[in-house]
């Protein structure tokens, strides 16, 4: 592929195309990857398809204005995003330590983007071109459009539209609204006065300027000074986050009014097909070849996006505030055509890594009502259980998988983007389940039960543990019948709001009973735009306004994390202290149900734990043996949990990186 098939990144590229000036210059905190898994690629190609000239400035040096001028002043304006991931999450771990690698940067090098990139870039653009139109979007802008709690500053920050000084904010996936914005700019409108488009935010000087039906939220001053008010404000945002029934929201910021128009409708199937058929080069720009490319492309190069939106609505997930709860999907033909294209890549080895989306086995709205009435205001589709009106049907997805796996040159089609096992179990037809196990598991199936404590699962918005048990038993039954050795990898989370030390110990006991120790544990990470983050900050559940326990101290968070890896000798002292603190000395000693040995009982060469660390035996034990292990519960655990089994029937020690939780 020749370099000039990418959009211009320098003046020479513009000259080669015969351009004197760009209509738009898109500034991004990621390296330039022209693949539809990256927002920069989609927005730039959608605008190109609408007839606009778009140039790209990727990862500019923000310490001067020079890089921001290298394509000249755009005719209509600058578009700015902070990359595919919020820059603060990209830079820092949950313990606020600097990460070692940036997968969206050449060589994985850190320091090529600033903290709060959207704000920094907008300031530099204003320095270079004072009165140019600036439109911000992407995940950073979308999830920070309201006044929001910021974990890294540990305070409530203003809307990013205020802090950045941009003229307009587009939120969500934004294909529809960005073209409409472009058309108005092209007609001569000032960006500040484009005010009626769904999925956009603007700043008004007074309430008299707002003509749409709207709700006035508590002001920035009010939510930043009172946590109960913050929680009440978030509840309104949460309820109105719907493109059908949602209303415009207004929030005062120091005498100005941030106006958040209702969300844009999700793209139809035909619209999605057109977006994904645009002439993406499906790789990084050739300028990165000398540095070995960009690692982020490896996760998506041989994967196919099937759908958008998620009906799961997990409390800790930001999908609700970005893509929304209404699921839409590409047509089978669109996906099959792209799969055929992938088979022609020189480095394709016959394996499609994924056909999915936020949740792989969602292909349509949860029920027929959603497209006309919107998602229910006071109910979740799948929590605490699956709604009776939810249409559970895997037939279309199954037919798609069959078509792709039959294509010449394709050896295997895997599913890696996450499956809702409760949705699978609710399907009365188990054909999909059988074919999933037979054809679409790469040795390990990743699912996200997250926890076992009923109390924690309630706050997470996750299904009851018994549903996972049923799924797990059926998975291993089918696996055994097929004569395969396949495992389940559970995503587990520590320190989620509502998780007390006894809840973490309950999870540790389950891990003990199945002889499984995760290599990695995810601490809850309070990121903007989620229900769980609001719980973390306010210590209230916004949906009920009841108090929520928050494991906030470093000591307790370390204890909860260590309990999930109690077999690790390095964690012995922390686990010991946690058990003593919780009054669970019954789990310290030499008994079969003890998590760790007593400090006085170590013999030469003995592990601090009473249990083997797993290893090959733990990975390869058959499911029948696992079933018997699940029945061996301590009397204390039974008393806590009642008769409901919420165990994890696991066979693998490895935990994969970088996948979204479902």
Curated annotation (Swiss-Prot):
Domain spans labelled Radical SAM core: 296-567
Please list the residue ranges that the record marks as compositionally biased, kind Basic and acidic residues. 618-632
Positions of the UniProt region annotated as Disordered: 597-662
**Record-level Gene Ontology MF annotations:** 4 iron, 4 sulfur cluster binding; catalytic activity; iron ion binding
Repeat is among the record's keywords: no
Record: residues binding [4Fe-4S] cluster:
310, 314, 317
Q: Which keywords does this chain's UniProt record carry?
A: 4Fe-4S, Iron, Iron-sulfur, Metal-binding, S-adenosyl-L-methionine
Question: Compositional bias (Basic residues) at which positions?
Answer: 633-644
Pfam families, per the entry? DUF3362 (PF11842), Radical_SAM (PF04055), Radical_SAM_N (PF08497)
- Paste the cofactor note: Binds 1 [4Fe-4S] cluster. The cluster is coordinated with 3 cysteines and an exchangeable S-adenosyl-L-methionine.
Q: Which InterPro entries match?
A: Elp3/MiaA/NifB-like_rSAM, rSAM, rSAM_horseshoe, UPF0313, UPF0313_C, UPF0313_N
Q: Which cofactor does it need?
A: [4Fe-4S] cluster
Q: Does the keyword tRNA-binding apply?
A: no
Q: Record's NCBIfam families?
A: SAM_YgiQ
The UniProt entry's sequence similarity note says: Belongs to the UPF0313 family.
What is the designated name of this protein?
UPF0313 protein CPR_1216
Q: Which organism is it from?
A: Clostridium perfringens (strain SM101 / Type A)
């Amino acid at each position: 592929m020749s370099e000039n098939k990418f959009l211009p990144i320098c003046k020479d590229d513009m000259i080669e195309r015969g351009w004197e000036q760009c209509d738009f210059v898109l500034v991004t905190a990621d390296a330039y990857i022209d693949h539809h898994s990256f927002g920069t690629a989609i927005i730039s190609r959608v605008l190109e398809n609408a007839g606009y000239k778009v140039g790209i400035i990727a990862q500019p040096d923000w310490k001067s204005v020079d890089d921001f001028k290298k394509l000249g002043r755009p005719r209509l304006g600058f578009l700015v995003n902070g990359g595919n991931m919020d820059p603060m999450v990209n830079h820092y771990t949950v313990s606020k330590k600097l990460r070692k690698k940036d997968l969206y940067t050449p060589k994985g090098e850190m320091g090529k983007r600033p903290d709060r990139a959207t704000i920094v870039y907008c300031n530099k653009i204003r320095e270079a071109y004072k009165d140019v139109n600036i439109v911000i979007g992407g995940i950073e802008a979308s999830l920070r459009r309201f006044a929001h709690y910021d974990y890294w500053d540990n305070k409530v920050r203003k809307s990013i539209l205020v802090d950045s000084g941009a003229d307009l904010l587009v939120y969500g996936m934004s294909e529809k609204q960005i073209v409409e914005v472009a058309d108005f700019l092209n007609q001569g409108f000032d960006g500040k006065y484009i005010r009626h488009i769904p999925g956009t935010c603007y700043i008004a000087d007074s309430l008299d300027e707002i003509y749409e039906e709207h709700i006035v939220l508590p002001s920035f001053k009010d939510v930043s000074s009172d946590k109960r008010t913050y929680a009440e404000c978030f509840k309104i945002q949460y309820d109105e986050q719907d493109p059908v029934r949602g209303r415009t929201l207004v929030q005062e910021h120091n005498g100005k009014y941030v106006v958040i128009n209702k969300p844009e409708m999700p793209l139809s199937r035909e619209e999605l097909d057109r977006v994904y058929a645009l002439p993406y080069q499906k790789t990084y720009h050739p300028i990165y070849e000398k540095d070995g490319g960009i690692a982020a492309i490896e996760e998506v190069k041989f994967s196919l996006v099937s759908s958008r939106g998620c009906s799961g609505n997990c409390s800790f997930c930001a999908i609700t505030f970005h893509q929304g709860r209404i699921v839409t999907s590409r047509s089978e033909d669109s996906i099959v055509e792209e799969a055929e294209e992938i088979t022609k890549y020189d480095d394709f080895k016959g394996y499609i890594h994924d056909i999915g989306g936020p949740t792989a086995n969602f292909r349509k709205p949860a029920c027929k009502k959603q497209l006309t009435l919107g998602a229910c205001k006071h109910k979740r589709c799948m929590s605490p259980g699956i709604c009776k009106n939810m249409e559970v049907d895997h037939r279309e997805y199954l037919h798609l998988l069959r078509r792709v796996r039959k294509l010449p040159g394709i050896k295997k089609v895997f599913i890696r983007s996450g499956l809702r096992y409760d949705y699978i179990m609710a399907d009365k037809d188990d054909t999909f389940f059988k074919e999933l196990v037979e054809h679409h598991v790469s040795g390990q199936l990743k699912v996200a039960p997250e926890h076992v404590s009923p109390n924690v699962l309630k706050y997470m918005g996750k299904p009851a543990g018994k549903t996972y048990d049923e799924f797990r038993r059926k998975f291993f039954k089918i696996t055994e019948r097929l004569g395969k050795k396949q495992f389940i990898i559970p995503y587990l989370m520590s320190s989620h709001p509502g998780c007390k030390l006894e809840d973490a110990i309950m999870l540790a006991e389950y891990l003990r009973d199945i002889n499984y120790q995760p290599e990695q544990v995810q601490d809850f990470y309070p990121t903007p735009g989620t229900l769980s983050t609001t719980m973390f900050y306010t210590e209230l559940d916004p949906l009920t306004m009841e108090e929520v326990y928050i494991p906030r101290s470093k000591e307790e968070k370390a204890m909860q994390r260590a309990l999930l890896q109690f077999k690790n000798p390095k964690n012995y002292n922390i686990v010991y202290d946690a058990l003593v603190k919780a009054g669970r000395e019954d789990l310290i000693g030499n008994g079969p149900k003890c998590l760790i040995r007593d400090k006085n009982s170590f013999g030469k060469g003995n592990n601090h734990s009473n249990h083997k660390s797993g290893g090959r035996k733990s990975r390869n034990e058959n499911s029948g043996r696992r079933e018997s292990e699940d029945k061996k519960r301590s009397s204390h655990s039974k008393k806590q949990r009642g008769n409901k089994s919420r165990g994890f029937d696991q066979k693998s020690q490895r935990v994969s990186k970088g996948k979204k939780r479902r």
